[in-house]
């Protein structure tokens, strides 16, 4: 997919996620199959079956979602605020749109997540989770505009 088209779709995905996070809802299963396009090629996020309501200061612990798109802390069964896992999944979707393949693949979930370096996890954590554990539960504004 071309970068301009991927940028347009990604902007709309992030906008939809930010909107749901403002409503205190985290999707938890973002993947291309749950990103639909209408007749005008506008993104519609679908399948909120694994979504959860989030509260400031509370954490989620359920391991859910599609392993190839789920954040490492979800697969490990760790705690998470919520919005950061949608950001991770969005990043994987962007990678797939631009490269045509997943960044990490394996049939075994443990091997899959061992392929994601600790440094990569920490970088994504630092960039995407700046406010997640302070109770704000919103995407950092620095990643929204992609112009």
Which residues does each predicted region cover?
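Eukaryotic serine/threonine protein kinase catalytic domain
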Residues: 1-147
